[in-house]
Swiss-Prot record:
Organism: Klebsiella pneumoniae (strain 342)
Subunit structure: Part of the 50S ribosomal subunit.
Gene that this polypeptide is encoded by: rpmE2
Family label: Belongs to the bacterial ribosomal protein bL31 family. Type B subfamily.
NCBIfam families assigned to the protein according to its UniProt record, in alphabetical order: L31, PRK01678.1
The entry's keywords: Ribonucleoprotein, Ribosomal protein
GO molecular function: structural constituent of ribosome
Record-given protein name: Large ribosomal subunit protein bL31B
Gene Ontology cellular component terms for the protein in this record: ribonucleoprotein complex; ribosome
Pfam families noted in UniProt: Ribosomal_L31
UniProt record, GO biological process: translation
Length: 87
């Protein structure tokens, strides 16, 4: 194996700016920014979405009807079809 070809693996602080949460995670990401957290200095990366802010993980996900397209069609236009059959 070749020596010194792998990027350095270190603890990095990711900051979810949408909910102001910080995560310490092992990563090889490169950044010039640093932050002091818990008395230590870590590389710092901002992110827009994390498990603390994504609707799927927070339970604020919109649920769509599990019905098929035919059921939705009947729900929307069923009154017209029934009225025409009775006439």
């Amino acid at each position: 194996m070749k020596a010194h070809i792998h990027p350095p693996y270190r603890t990095v602080v990711f900051h979810d700016t949408s909910v102001n949460e910080y995560f310490k995670v092992g990563s090889t990401i490169r950044t010039d920014r640093v932050i002091e957290l818990d008395g230590e200095t870590f590389p710092y990366v901002t992110i827009d979405v994390s498990s603390k802010s994504h609707p799927y993980y927070t339970g604020k996900q919109k649920t769509f009807a599990s019905e098929g397209s035919a059921a939705r069609f009947r729900q929307r236009f069923g009154g017209f079809i029934d009225a025409k059959r009775k006439a």
